[in-house]
């Protein structure tokens, strides 16, 4: 009964808060050539970028505020940054509001990420300080005036040179191409069906990429990096803390690096693979005929490699503790003072280097 009463009380507060909220719609259109570099920037909220039907960059912001006065103080304008690049920027009344409140609905209004979850709603996230539009401002989930903007950006269906910067909140892009930077200070990033030179950078949050072609780099201070479906030259995933998962990737080079977390690679056709984790295992399935070089390094964790059944290879392992096992029956063991430190098969075309501080290693034929 107490649990039900608490739940009803929470729902009542949420409904009351939602009823008090004022919304307003702002529209901005980029002047000048959309093929030239440009930026779209927001302080707090969710940002969605999609391909439109026209030849202009058009952004619509839905402002959410505690009252009409705050909502009316918001603007959406084109300015220039310190490098002279045009910026479509949501202008907040930061001369009088030094702390604003942003409450994402269950962690995300648009994309279904897990990494914020209910921490936003119930206040376990206590805020972050941001430099924005010449001001220092604090964005919190529990204090300050409610004030944020959810943005939808529509861009031409051709190559762009664009940065989409969302300081606090989720950022998603779908069906666009060019030289693209997706950047959040705190919030997850989703990239679907992108083409070109694509970079996703978040200080804290999960990065999810699907069906990307060209080159893709993911950098997150804390959070998972998940890539499913890649075809291009280079794929790089780097996280300070969190798992890296790559599936169905074709690339000349795949790099996966995490300070703490597992690296899992499935159905990867790569010329070269480099995996490095401070704490956590590496499990990589490397298929295809282009494979030439593998480097797997873990401070603590097991390394499991699966390579083509017909591969000629040479593998050497430097292990603080743990043993090396090879599942190729016709491979020749390389000994050092009665200890197996490597294996050789055929002409050794694929060079494999394994380094573990603590943990075993296996090299097996892929099924």
Regions flagged by a language model, labelled:
Residues 1-367:
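Intrinsically disordered, low-complexity terminal regions
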